[in-house]
Amino acid sequence: MSVEYYLSLYAKYNSKNLDVFRNMLQVIEPSGNYHILHAYCGIKGLDERFIEELLHRGYSPNETDDDGNYPLHIASKINNNRIVAMLLVHGADPNACDKHNKTPLYYLSGTDDEVIERINLLVQYGAKINNSVDEEGCGPLLACTDPSERVFKKIMSIGFEARIVDKFGKNHIHRHLMSDNPKASTISWMMKLGISPSKPDHDGNTPLHIVCSKTVKYVDIINLLLPSTDVNKQNKFGDSPLTLLIKTLSPAHLINKLISTSNVITDQTVNICIFYDRDDVLEIINDKGKQYDSTDFKMAVEVGSIRCVKYLLDNDIICEDAMYYAVLSEYETMVDYLLFNHFSVDSIVNGHTCMSECVRLNNPVILSKLMLHNPTSETMYITMKEIEKDKLDKSIIIPFIAYFVLMHPDFCKNCRYFTSYKRFVTDYVHEGVSYEVFDDYF
């Protein structure tokens, strides 16, 4: 093993001695194989004299390691301003870009004083302010998603444009809201600096869209952004801040806050309330003056929203054919709820009955529930006609029809009903049976 290899191992040693380090350097020729300078620049709290010795020995501050990092980037990332200064004095390029197309100015970790000191150092040695754009289309300031006010204003004072957006159209407020812990105070001073709180990005999302879509609801931020944004403004996916709040199961009082600022409640908002089973929000919307009708009840049945069905039912809003749509959706719980509330099993839509659709869906469980609730003879007649017309499998309904006829003697007294029933059963019993063996006898 070369001495340079042992020098790379020494970088990991906790108690480093500068004299030992110098002795090791005396027998080393820089090879570039072990990225020695990079390794030592990445040690937190390292005495800058170690770096100075490496630089004097011939290690270049302008070479990249295997990850595309320069020593200056590494020192900036770990917030070691003394090493940053040492590298700059020895010719490190403050405008070099790593593999993410970021210059050292992008790495602004540390306290406000430390960050401002590092900015001053980099600018003093020629860092260019406005010509670096990373992979997301951000300059150094825009890439910093959670800056302090002091740092933000410091960078602006040396030439950064505060109103730029990234390649997705997101400005500083958008990007701050995407950080782990966005703060209303940060957004407030950004707004005072002229950054728009209502600007949509390329997907049509305003800052209010973003904060309303977050799992954690930052009420203070919503209150701050609410006056500047229409809560019904849709992004390109059709979502508004209001619908995003509903979709993320936000508390009703917060949704009410947005509704109170809106002059119009759209049908889309009502539909989303129903889809997400938000009867509490339906009540808020109703108090706002929105009227519901049978179409809303039908949708609630189709999506299986028991709460919304109950709310609408309590407010005398129904759909006469609700049972039919519950069968189509195959929501057994909804079927049970409607049966309990005495909804008719005799719904007929476009010639289809609830029973014929059970056969079409091959759902004997729901069929058995419906047959126990006494469909009329006319309904059963239409059911048989529909099954025969569409050539559906009769096997699951034959036992139910036989029992129905047995329990309804009047059914057979009607010539039309009885003839249809006889043909229905006879065709099923004789289906696929060949009588060719009897040809010689006739």
Swiss-Prot record:
The identity of this protein, by name, is Inhibitor of Apoptosis OPG037
Q: Name one Pfam family in it.
A: Ank_2
The principal localisation class reads: host cell
- Report the sequence similarity comment from the record: Belongs to the orthopoxvirus OPG037 family.
What is the protein's known function? Inhibits host apoptosis. Acts by associating with host apoptosome.
- List UniProt keywords, sorted A-Z: ANK repeat, Early protein, Host cytoplasm, Host-virus interaction, Modulation of host cell apoptosis by virus, Repeat
Subunit structure as annotated in this protein's UniProt entry: May interact with host caspase-9-Apaf-1 complex.
**InterPro entries assigned:** Ankyrin_rpt (IPR002110), Ankyrin_rpt-contain_sf (IPR036770), Multifunctional_ANK_Repeat (IPR051165)
Q: Which PROSITE patterns match?
A: ANK_REP_REGION, ANK_REPEAT
Q: What induces it?
A: Expressed in the early phase of the viral replicative cycle.
Q: In its keyword annotation, does this UniProt entry include Metal-binding?
A: no
* CC annotations in GO: host cell cytoplasm
Asked if the Swiss-Prot or TrEMBL record annotates the protein with the keyword Repeat, the reply is yes
Stretches forming ANK repeats: 67-96, 100-131, 203-233, 237-267, 292-321, 323-347
| Gene Ontology terms: biological process | symbiont-mediated perturbation of host apoptosis
Top-level taxon: Viruses
Where's it found, cell-wise? Host cytoplasm
